[in-house]
């Protein structure tokens, strides 16, 4: 069974983990109401997508993320 020959130093651990950081989420401005939303997603505030109303305004949107 394979076993490490030496203890991994903290600096080497950090170098290995340097690529594990999460990236920034992209945000776009809704063309209808100006609220921030995810690109290519229905606006969670007004229910518009691509200039059209897809979900009735005021209706609770299940599974939406408000940014």
Curated annotation (Swiss-Prot):
GO annotation (BP), single: translation
Protein name per UniProt: Large ribosomal subunit protein bL32
Region (Disordered): 1-23
Protein family (similarity comment): Belongs to the bacterial ribosomal protein bL32 family.
Ranges of biased composition (kind: Basic residues): 1-20
GO-annotated cellular components: large ribosomal subunit
Gene name tied to this protein: rpmF
Positions of transmembrane segments: none
UniProt keyword annotation of Ribosomal protein present: yes
């Amino acid at each position: 069974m394979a076993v490490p020959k030496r203890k991994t130093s903290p600096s080497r651990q950090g170098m290995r983990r340097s690529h594990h950081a999460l990236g920034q989420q992209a945000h776009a401005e809704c063309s209808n109401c100006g609220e921030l939303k995810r690109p290519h997603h229905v606006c969670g505030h007004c229910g518009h997508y691509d200039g059209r109303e897809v979900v009735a305004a005021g209706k609770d949107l299940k599974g939406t993320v408000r940014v």
